[in-house]
Amino acid sequence: IALAAAADLTRTVNYVIDSGSLPMQVGDKGKLTIDVSGVIENVRVLSDQTGDIVFDISKTTFADYPAFNSITAAQRIQLTNTDKYFDDVLNNWTTNIVAGDILRFDVISVNQIRRVLISLKLKL
């Protein structure tokens, strides 16, 4: 039996920023080590409520830690008076991820939102 399509060689990296019952603050919200190599195909963001948030994703290698460089360039992720965001164009992003890279998530500004899910789809 022949397969009609090649296997889906993608992985989704999910990261949750949650401030609990308190207002979310700006700054470094944590780091995540990625264990696969691939290319980011899209980013999807869901928040707990309508509001505003701007954040950046940076990456580094284990050898270069703690120096990080933004992968979003001037195209930071931004929700404005909404609860969701999707981008599959990723203009000027650094989309290559190498196994062992470390991602950092920084909130630049926020209003109303207390919890946000960031999903990066990687093509392996």
What are the residue ranges of the model-derived segments?
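Extracellular and analogous surface-interaction loops
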Residues: 27-39, 93-95
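Short loop/turn segments at connectors of secondary-structure elements within structured domains
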Residues: 39, 51-54, 99, 112-114
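A short beta-strand element within beta-rich, extracytoplasmic domains
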Residues: 37-49
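Glycine-rich, low-complexity segments
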Residues: 1-24, 48, 54, 58, ...
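Noncatalytic modules at the cell exterior or secretory-pathway interfaces
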Residues: 92-109
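C-terminal interaction-tip segments
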Residues: 16-25, 29-31, 108-124
